[in-house]
Amino acid sequence: MNPNPQSTSSNFHQTELDKFAALANRWWDADGPQKPLHALNPVRLDYVAARVALPGARVLDVGCGGGLLSEAMARLGAQVTAIDLAPELVKVARLHSLESSVQVDYRVQSVEDLAAEQPGSFDAVTCMEMLEHVPDPLAIIRACASLLKPGGTLFLSTLNRTPAAFALAVVGAEYIARLLPKGTHHYKDFIKPSELAAWLRTAELQLQDVSGMLYEPWRNRARLSSRTEVNYLACAVKP
């Protein structure tokens, strides 16, 4: 796959784009390689909807993949723009949107480029399961902050850099239970909540909440939790 010609950003690993692009055709298969993501999606949606009135809100989904969260927010009435650097994923997202008749503005574009074009345009920005896959997470957060209107909210989810996260998200999920393709995650790129909080302060955002997100593979269900050792969600507001 060639780098996206529409983007001037270099804030991506081509191997990461290729890895997820290879999953494009089964992105919406609830029993496929993205099975855990399908289980996490209702939790992510509820977390956002509890903090932002989605009907009529302008929302940007950064690193949208095949559009699971994008479509879910649009179904609740949000005006969703969704971006990703993998053309294969955006194509799948657009096709599914046509099948479901849920309107989402999907684009192959970097968040940095969009921030240069449309600063201060969105009531909320979501960036889920993406920061641990890019070379410069702070640059992503800065761009997201720029895109928010004053009073807008940034929603993030990622993986904590702990022994528990390594054991469960890497060894357990990829090599033992085989819930995810091998190589999906790299432990060194996981992000501690304290690191995320520091980046949010640097981007002049005010951290509002950090909540754990627990995935139960034996039930294929996920829920919010007070434990942040593995997956966690965070939200921050632009003053």
Swiss-Prot record:
Q: What is the similarity comment for this entry?
A: Belongs to the methyltransferase superfamily. UbiG/COQ3 family.
Summarize the protein's role.
Answer: O-methyltransferase that catalyzes the 2 O-methylation steps in the ubiquinone biosynthetic pathway.
Q: Which reaction does it catalyse?
A: a 3-demethylubiquinol + S-adenosyl-L-methionine = a ubiquinol + S-adenosyl-L-homocysteine + H(+); a 3-(all-trans-polyprenyl)benzene-1,2-diol + S-adenosyl-L-methionine = a 2-methoxy-6-(all-trans-polyprenyl)phenol + S-adenosyl-L-homocysteine + H(+)
Protein name, as recorded: Ubiquinone biosynthesis O-methyltransferase
List GO BP terms, alphabetically.
Answer: methylation
Lineage summary: Bacteria, Pseudomonadati, Pseudomonadota, Gammaproteobacteria, Lysobacterales
Q: Which GO MF terms does the UniProt record name? A: 2-polyprenyl-6-hydroxyphenol methylase activity; 3-demethylubiquinol 3-O-methyltransferase activity; methyltransferase activity; polyprenyldihydroxybenzoate methyltransferase activity
Q: Which Pfam families match?
A: Methyltransf_23
Q: Which cysteines are joined by disulfide bonds?
A: none
Residues binding S-adenosyl-L-methionine: 44, 63, 84, 128
Task: Write down the EC number.
Answer: 2.1.1.222, 2.1.1.64
Q: In which pathway does it act?
A: Cofactor biosynthesis; ubiquinone biosynthesis
Question: In the UniProt record, does the keyword RNA-binding occur?
Answer: no
Sorted UniProt keywords: Methyltransferase, S-adenosyl-L-methionine, Transferase, Ubiquinone biosynthesis
To which species is this protein native? Xanthomonas campestris pv. campestris (strain ATCC 33913 / DSM 3586 / NCPPB 528 / LMG 568 / P 25)
- CDD domains linked: AdoMet_MTases
Against HAMAP family, the record matches this protein to: UbiG (MF_00472)
The keyword Mitochondrion belongs to this UniProt entry's keyword annotation? no
